[in-house]
Amino acid sequence: LIALSLRWKHYVPALLAAVLLSACGGGGDSGNNAAQLTSTPAGQLTQEPGAPVLSNNIATDGFNWINYRRSQVGLAPLVRNSLIDSAAQGHTSYLNINNLVAHEQIQGKPGFTGVAPYDRIIKSGYAITSVWGEVIAGVATNSGFYMAENLITAIYHRFVIFEPLFKEGGAGSAVNSSGYAYFTTDLAGNSRYGLGLPTGQVITYPFNGQVKVATSFSSNEETPDPVPNQDVVGYPISVHANFDATLSVTAFTVRQHGSGTDLTVRLLTKSTDPINTARSVAAIIPLAPLLANTTYDVSFIGKVSGADVTRSWSFTTR
């Protein structure tokens, strides 16, 4: 089970988990959707050169993996904050005690620390003045790396994790007697936002030159389903701007290196997917799994708040 929550002024994904992944949040406007995911088996998530050193602490490893991926795409890593740690650990303990995965707590239940992520972060003593978010993973694994990577695979969750303006975060973990692990990362900002991206800039994922990218993604296991009526699809490819920017797409394509034919994809933008996709992000999802050990070329042409943006990059599957 994985859950994610975010609050910001313009985009409020609210993803509530039933099985494996979820996200929820707010910050001004509000909206609701849900997300679940089973992705790469843990045994297939291999340690990469330059990756964080495994600590065998779920909270630390999950938090560090999120920062590792953020750094790889050119985003500022989240600064770990002890007050946010307290909020995340309190909620993780609540989930473990009550054997569930959810963003909202019910007053009166054992371990109650606050109804919503915002309440819990504020109660910890952290003064939120801008954005907040929450990621929760619950799965029978002891790998924080794996839990965080699952969230990044799920496209609606990735949109939030790779928000450029997040500033600080904290994490907590717990494991029950059956070996079922819970991992929570809370993200927030005060004194406005993090540095974000320069005006008119974007980041992409998979990033240019990335290797060992997964070939497929189980769309049915993320709710809302990003590719309705189809389960196994190709690995999602995404473009991200600051949340207060407007990203428009003129062309967004992917093809096997050396091929003259673009893959058939589903495009996610604010105009094609208005409920679940923010105005600052876009993604394409190939409608068939990618080939193993194959390089793919991606092209994006569009605008960020009216400024022309063109990107061409490649990645290679495992």
Positions of PLM-derived features:
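Sec-dependent N-terminal signal peptides
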Residues: 14-18
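Bacterial N-terminal signal peptides that target proteins for export
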Residues: 1-13
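A generic local structural motif
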Residues: 5-6, 138-139, 283
